[in-house]
Structures are given as C-alpha cells and as structure tokens.
Amino acid sequence: MSLLADLVNLDISDNSEKIIAEYIWVGGSGMDMRSKARTLPGPVTDPSKLPKWNYDGSSTGQAPGQDSEVILYPQAIFKDPFRRGNNILVMCDAYTPAGEPIPTNKRHAAAEIFANPDVIAEVPWYGIEQEYTLLQKDVNWPLGWPIGGFPGPQGPYYCSIGADKSFGRDIVDAHYKASLYAGINISGINGEVMPGQWEFQVGPSVGISAADEIWIARYILERITEIAGVVVSFDPKPIPGDWNGAGAHTNYSTKSMREEGGYEIIKKAIEKLGLRHKEHISAYGEGNERRLTGHHETADINTFLWGVANRGASIRVGRDTEKEGKGYFEDRRPASNMDPYVVTSMIAETTLLWNP
C-alpha cells in the first residue's frame, strides 16, 4: 500500500511539462457531479485556452442514446489539491454539438444575468453557507449516531468538541485546507446543530464566481469523503423529526447596499424578494418543504417574513447592518441541495433587473 500511496502522490512535474486537467460538470440529476481527466501539454491558467471536450450524455441522463454526445466548455480553473503540482480542476458547463446549453446547464443563463451592465455596475457579493450531513456508508445513517438509534437531543453539538459530540472533523479540516489550496474563497467551517452535520462558508465572492466556487468545493468534499469511506448528503432534511435540516443560507450585497444609505436599498430589495417568494421557493432546492416548517430556525415555506437578527425569518438582516445603515442581508430559504447558479443569479435578477 505504501507504493500505491507513493504513486498516487507522485509529482510528475519533476520530469514532464505535461499536466492533468480534471474536467468537472453537473450531472443529469442537477445535483450529482461527474468528472474525467485528460493530459495537456503544459500548464494552463486561462480557461479560454483549454480545449473543449465531450462525454456520453446518455450515461448521465443528459442525452438520448442515439445522439449522446455532449460538449464540455471549460469555464473556471482551480488548483488540484489531490494531484497538486501544476495539475488543475476545471469547472465546465455542458452544451449540445450545435452549441445550445443542455437543460441541466444552469450556468449559461446565470452568466447572461451576471453579464448585464446593470448587474456588473452593482458588483454583487455573495457569501454562501453550505450545510451538509456525513453518513455512515453502508447504513445511510449520520456519522456518530448509533446504527438504528438516535443520539441525545440537540444542544451539545453546535460548534462542539469531543469524541462524544463532534463526528467527522478530520474530513472537515481536510476539505477546508484542500479548498484553500484550490483557490476557493472558503471563509470558515463549523459543526452544526444536528450531530454529524457540518457547514462551510464560501465568500464574499463576486457574481458567478461564487457559484463556481461552491460547485468545486462540493466536488472536493465528495472526493474526500470517497477516500474516507463516508457518504456526504446534501438532503435538506436527512432525518425526520426534531432535528435541524440543512440549508445554504445566501448572504448578498450590492455596491449600493454597501455604501451610505444602503439600508434603504436593502429594504427595497427585500420587498422585491417578498413579491416573488413563490418563484424563488420553487427554484431553491428539492424537498425544501421538509425543511422550511417554521421550526428549527426556519420560516414556514408559505410565509415570507424578514427581520433583524431573526433566524426564524425568510430574510435576516444583521444587527451591524441595521446599526451602520449599510451592509448585506441573508436569504435563509435556499436548501442545502440548491443550485448556486440558479440561486445567486435569481437574487441578482429580482433585486437589480426585475420591476414589479
């Protein structure tokens, strides 16, 4: 096994200019991630300099068997924390051979919104809090829970330490460091309210880069849990009952919100979000109705409510933002399995482009 580990960690840059590029894309479910690798003649830092590639879309639920070729367009480059050296991870989106985005390509429409001059001028910042649950591989039950049983009630686990309260920290810390190495603007991690559940935060990142970074951070997490023999779940309510669900709270601000008088701009933006509540909920993740119950630090899915420091609201404004009269707000509605391309671009569209 030591020889295998040595070969896995072999630094090919010692005797070759060639690099390995891992092309990554979102699969047919809209949540599964797929990837495959190719050799390139030398280091690349600009995604536009990377070749397009293709894959069998009939094997990912993204194309019929009789016309199965789907084309990958490289969009963002990150350093590869697994192969290291000059090797890279490449976030791609997917198109038909005719150049049309396939239905599961949510990046294309998001990029159009973020390319709008009115959106560019406002330099939208996002900070996304990605929650997830670690599961024991063969029993599909949270890490640290007795098989077929339950731990003690919630309370001791949030931001906890100790072998009886904190489960999976080695995975979490490995993911944290690997994400930093990759160039993701990961800003922190913490243990969550339900045992076996964790969170990492990405941002503040500008525009579509926030969504690219979340997808690559998810990819890195899936790869690390694969190595550890643990399953990661982004289900918004993995365990029914008196247990917290998993969300992807999305913090948002624009240039106008960050400047003097920004609090008034924030309130107008929140008013717009309230008017489109149903549209946003329908795009904020599968199974979110199991999570947004009005309990466990959530608002009811059918009710739009905002407030200062209120974690039972749809939109929360921080005390600092209220006090300073400028800043950001937090959309607490997105589920942990949301598509960040959809959520970030929809918030920008509603607050900056949509006129009631």
From Swiss-Prot:
PROSITE patterns: GLNA_1, GLNA_ATP, GS_BETA_GRASP, GS_CATALYTIC. Keywords: Acetylation, ATP-binding, Cytoplasm, Ligase, Nitrogen fixation, Nucleotide-binding, Phosphoprotein. Its EC number is 6.3.1.2. Signal peptide: none annotated. SMART domains: Gln-synt_C. Induction: By ammonium supply under nitrogen-limited condition. Induced by sucrose, glucose, fructose, and during leaf senescence. Expressed in the pericycle of all root tissues. It is found in: Cytoplasm. Residues 106-356 form the GS catalytic domain. GO terms for biological process: glutamine biosynthetic process. Residues 19-99 form the GS beta-grasp domain. The keyword Nucleotide-binding applies. The modification N-acetylserine is found at residue 2. Homooctamer. Interacts with GRF3. Belongs to the glutamine synthetase family. Low-affinity glutamine synthetase. May contribute to the homeostatic control of glutamine synthesis in roots. This is Glutamine synthetase cytosolic isozyme 1-2. It comes from Arabidopsis thaliana.
